[in-house]
Amino acid sequence: MERIPYLGHTILKWQVGTSTFLALPEKGARLMNWNVTLGDGTVRDIVYWPEVKALDDFHKIRGGNPILFPFCGRTFDRSDIHFWSGEDGIRRPMPMHGYARQGDFRTTRLDEGGFSAQFIPSEEAKAAYPYDYEFIVSYRFEKTGFHVELELNNRGTVPIPWSAGHHFYFTLPWTTGLKRKDYILEVPATKTLKHMDSGRLIEGPRLSQRETLDNPALIDTIHTGLRGHTFSVTERGSGQQLKFNTGFTNTTARDAAVVTWTSDDKAPYYCVEPWMGPPNSPENKAGLHHVGPGQTQKFLVEITLN
């Protein structure tokens, strides 16, 4: 593990075999970049990070893996966006994707294999999500991929609702000259959903379990009703594949979701996002998990390059 100065901050670098990982644990527990050195000496970016001049709006940078906690996507309370209501019926604010991605973290583990970091809630986050908890993000880096674990420990006396997730930005295309049509997404979903501006989830669009990434219907689509915990993106011709495995500890995977998104057809990235459930989970209840007093739940994601 190596410390590197970067735009007035110190980021961390791990070299594991031919893989290099860059992260800034204290800012959103953010994995910034994953790249691989190929046999000919060239470097291929897998997790995308853009060229930026400053880190002032770190959470707004489209790159790396922003952590989404306590809830993914937009939340609503009776059609009003950026609010939510808990079991007590009190309306509270909740920004898109929650508070962790723009939050501060304290590093609790730092070694040659990765890091763990604990969320330090701001006063705003404490008021909006008023529970006694520990939220910990842990990465373990390997030669051909990594594991990331989201852990919520309930230190209080009431159940804590959550539905966290990841917002991975992947470099696309992987190979010069290829297009999005050359990449195949395979997700074992039995249902697709769209999130409406009212907060409701509606069914559609109609998609197969095997789609190329140039299909515009994939953008902002929630894939759920998963028949398995494995999905992938494969490059035609070379057969190179990013394989995802997800898992849960002490809770059900019934409403687990994969969200696909990109900003436009010219963006140098494509987001494939494992979520614990669909957006607006406090209101729609789909994918909403509860951690009992004294209990712990985990959401696990493994990504490997084959």
Regions found by a protein language model. Give the residues of each.
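Surface-exposed acidic/polar loop and edge beta-strand patches at domain peripheries
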Residues: 1-147, 155-161, 168-306
